[in-house]
């Protein structure tokens, strides 16, 4: 330390802390008067103000480093505090930390400023509300006079709108609205397209007196208006200078599709769509003619057989606006034609039904069926009746999908009789009539049935047909020829349609002498259909002979057999024999018993794959001895479980096990202990230190030379 006569001087070391980060230390020399008893903080600040400016004193808080219980602490200081030097070294160390209340040094903001801003914003909002209300009032006032202005020229409209805008501006100024109006007002000239655009920017409501302006964007505000000298400065986005007159309510052809009392609004696109629809629907259309045309488009009942000429005549009569008397006459003519058509249709249906069924009370013929008979045609067999009794022949039934997809080339009469026995359109005759019924008709009657319908003479009466049917019913026909023909037909059917199911009767039950014939009772659809849509049943069987002796050795070339049976559940394949690893454990007797069991299971008498096994021949399953496999000892007399148990007990007791040498083995090279199996792996890479040193010398000779030098 250097001391003078008037003052003393010391070396002070200080650090500044900005945002929690310390700067590099600075060294200064401070002078202080000797009569004050030591260096004070005021003297240091005075020196710093001279060196670094006035702000450094107010921006930091100062503390000095001092000893405290064999440690160092920082002692906060004020201006009049004496700075104590460190013991031993006698140094003065100061640290300046940035103050937390730095906002107090900023210029003071008066709270009245915020209140002024709030007042100004409230005034702006009030001005906006007043402007918006005034604009709505003006629009409502002008909507009533819009109808009168449409008859005036465009120039007069603009003048009127200019005068109204001036009146509106005067009203706004009287209410305190801030409006900037230039002194030199020019005449306004606006194109008609601009007015239409301004009109379309408003949305129409249901009532004629309510028009609400649409919010405009910045792009919408740019309108092709020329020579506009009137500018209204407002804060509202809904009022743009001129108050555009509201469009008047739409007329009937362009009326929006909503009721007058609702509050629904339509925008510009919806209005254009409605205009397009209305103009398109109402263009050159006579409502009277359209109503007549709509009335003419009526579906004709399917039972009427009126031709195109009748329809055109009726349409021509309807299209001509005739008198009521002529209309009544036309209706009477049409009714007569309909009655005649119904009578002719009903008569034709009866004739066709009698020809179709051959006088039988049940069944109809299979469509698209043809039958070629080598026998000559006879006129007596043309309208042969169908038999109502059971026949001794075989009944052939086919499924619905086969009957619809495959054309039957030669069906027998029994097939037709049974296939169509469910249609009961007439009552079953009593049993006395069934006694006189003969056996089924021959193939000549079958050929007659397949004759075209156009051969029927419509002039024949029903009574004549019934008489012919009774005459034919009294005749009897030979049976042997019918049975032979039937057998040949069945062969043809079985070849062409393999999926047909044939049910053969054991003995004939009808046409016996002295026994009454039984009438057929119609059966349900489920009883008629014998086959289903599922796959056919396939069974594969194996011979019950025992397997060859070499099968258990894995040398058998036979493949496993799968059982395919129709089930509701998904099919699963059942192998005939077990996998080879399991079969090896069987003896020859067990293999033979297993093969006999599989043969019994797969026999055709048993439909299901599962069968009850006898207790004499049980199936033996192989069991793996896991304990014998896992407890194979690593070293003689000691298993894996033994040394794992010893290690676990040692860890629990925190003591080495007594037989530690027997469990873990020590490496002779490095002295580490390993399990017996791990020690062998370790010994492959463990080498003595001399070997490692020599290897490193050969690998890096320059290192050895540097050490030697």
Curated annotation (Swiss-Prot):
Zn(2+) binds at residues 667, 670, 682, 686. Residues 242-266, 315-344, 358-393, 411-439, 506-560 are annotated as: Disordered. InterPro entries: SOK, SOK_DIX, Znf_C2HC_C3H. GO terms for cellular component: plasma membrane. Its cofactor is Zn(2+). The keyword S-adenosyl-L-methionine does not apply. GO terms for molecular function: protein homodimerization activity; zinc ion binding. Residues 8-101 are annotated as: DIX-like oligomerization domain. Residues 529-544 have a biased composition (Polar residues). Pfam families: SOK, zf-C2HC_2. Homodimer. Forms long polymer filaments with other SOKs proteins polymers crucial for polar localization and biological activity. Belongs to the SOSEKI family. SOSEKI proteins locally interpret global polarity cues and can influence cell division orientation to coordinate cell polarization relative to body axes. This is Protein SOSEKI 3. It comes from Physcomitrium patens.
């Amino acid at each position: 330390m250097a001391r003078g006569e008037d003052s003393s001087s010391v070396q002070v070391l200080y650090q500044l802390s900005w945002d929690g980060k310390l700067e590099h230390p600075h060294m200064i020399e401070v002078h202080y008067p000797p009569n004050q008893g030591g260096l004070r903080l005021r003297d240091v600040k005075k020196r710093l103000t001279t060196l670094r400016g006035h702000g450094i004193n107010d921006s930091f808080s100062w503390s000095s480093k001092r000893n405290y219980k064999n440690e160092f602490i920082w002692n906060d200081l004020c201006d009049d505090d004496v700075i104590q030097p460190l013991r031993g070294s006698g140094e003065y160390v100061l640290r300046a930390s940035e103050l937390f209340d730095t906002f107090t040094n900023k210029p003071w903001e008066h709270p009245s400023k915020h209140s002024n801003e709030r007042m100004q914003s409230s005034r702006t909002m009030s001005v906006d509300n007043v402007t918006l209300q005034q604009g709505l009032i003006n629009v409502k006032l002008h909507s009533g006079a819009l109808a009168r202005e449409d008859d005036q020229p465009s120039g007069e409209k603009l003048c009127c709108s200019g005068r109204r805008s001036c009146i509106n501006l005067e009203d706004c100024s009287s209410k305190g609205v801030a409006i900037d109006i230039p002194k030199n007002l020019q005449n306004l000239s606006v194109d008609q397209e601009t007015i239409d655009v301004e009109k379309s920017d408003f949305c129409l409501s249901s009532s004629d007196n309510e028009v609400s302006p649409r919010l405009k964007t910045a792009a919408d505000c740019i309108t092709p208006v020329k020579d506009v000298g009137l500018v209204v400065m407002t804060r509202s986005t809904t009022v743009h200078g001129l108050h555009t007159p509201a469009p008047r309510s739409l007329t009937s052809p362009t009326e929006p599709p909503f009721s007058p009392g609702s509050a629904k609004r339509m925008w510009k696109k919806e209005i254009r769509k409605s205009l397009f629809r209305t103009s398109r629907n109402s263009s050159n259309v006579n409502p009277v003619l359209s109503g007549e045309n709509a009335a003419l488009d009526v579906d004709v009942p399917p039972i009427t057989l009126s031709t195109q000429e009748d329809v055109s005549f009726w349409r021509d009569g309807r299209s001509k606006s005739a008198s009521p008397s002529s209309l009544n006459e036309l209706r009477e003519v049409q009714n007569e034609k309909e009655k005649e058509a119904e009578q002719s249709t009903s008569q034709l249906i009866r004739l066709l039904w009698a020809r179709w069924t051959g006088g039988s009370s049940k069944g109809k013929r299979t469509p698209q069926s043809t039958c070629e008979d080598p026998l000559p045609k006879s006129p007596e067999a043309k309208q042969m009746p169908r038999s109502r009794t059971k026949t001794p022949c075989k009944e052939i039934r086919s499924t619905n999908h086969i009957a619809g997809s495959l054309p039957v080339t030669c069906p027998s009469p029994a097939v037709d009789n049974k296939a169509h026995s469910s249609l009961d359109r007439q009552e079953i005759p009593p049993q006395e009539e069934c006694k006189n019924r003969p056996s089924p008709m021959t193939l000549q009657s079958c050929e007659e049935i397949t004759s075209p319908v156009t051969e029927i003479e419509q002039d024949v009466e029903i009574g004549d047909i019934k008489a012919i049917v009774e005459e034919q019913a009294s005749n009897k026909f030979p049976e042997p020829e019918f049975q032979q023909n039937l057998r040949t037909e069945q062969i043809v059917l079985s070849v062409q349609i393999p999926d047909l199911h044939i049910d053969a009767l054991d003995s004939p039950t009808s046409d016996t002498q002295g026994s009454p014939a039984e009438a057929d009772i119609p059966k349900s659809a489920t009883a008629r259909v014998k086959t289903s849509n599922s796959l056919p049943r396939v069974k594969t069987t194996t011979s019950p002979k025992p397997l060859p002796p070499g099968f258990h050795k894995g040398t058998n070339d036979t493949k496993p057999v799968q059982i395919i049976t129709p089930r509701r559940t998904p099919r699963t394949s059942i192998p005939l024999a077990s996998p080879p690893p399991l079969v090896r454990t069987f003896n020859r007797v067990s293999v033979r018993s297993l093969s006999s069991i599989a043969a019994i299971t797969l026999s055709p008498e048993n439909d299901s794959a599962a069968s009850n096994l006898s207790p004499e021949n049980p199936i033996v399953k192989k069991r793996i001895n896991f304990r014998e496999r896992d407890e194979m000892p690593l070293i003689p007399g000691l298993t894996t479980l033994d040394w794992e148990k010893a290690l676990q007990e040692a860890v629990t007791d925190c003591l080495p096990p007594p037989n530690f040498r027997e469990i873990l083995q020590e490496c002779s090279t490095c002295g580490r202990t390993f399990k017996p199996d791990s020690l062998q792996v370790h010994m492959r890479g463990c080498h003595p230190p001399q070997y490692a040193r020599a290897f490193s010398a050969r690998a890096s000779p320059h290192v050895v030379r540097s050490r030697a030098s």
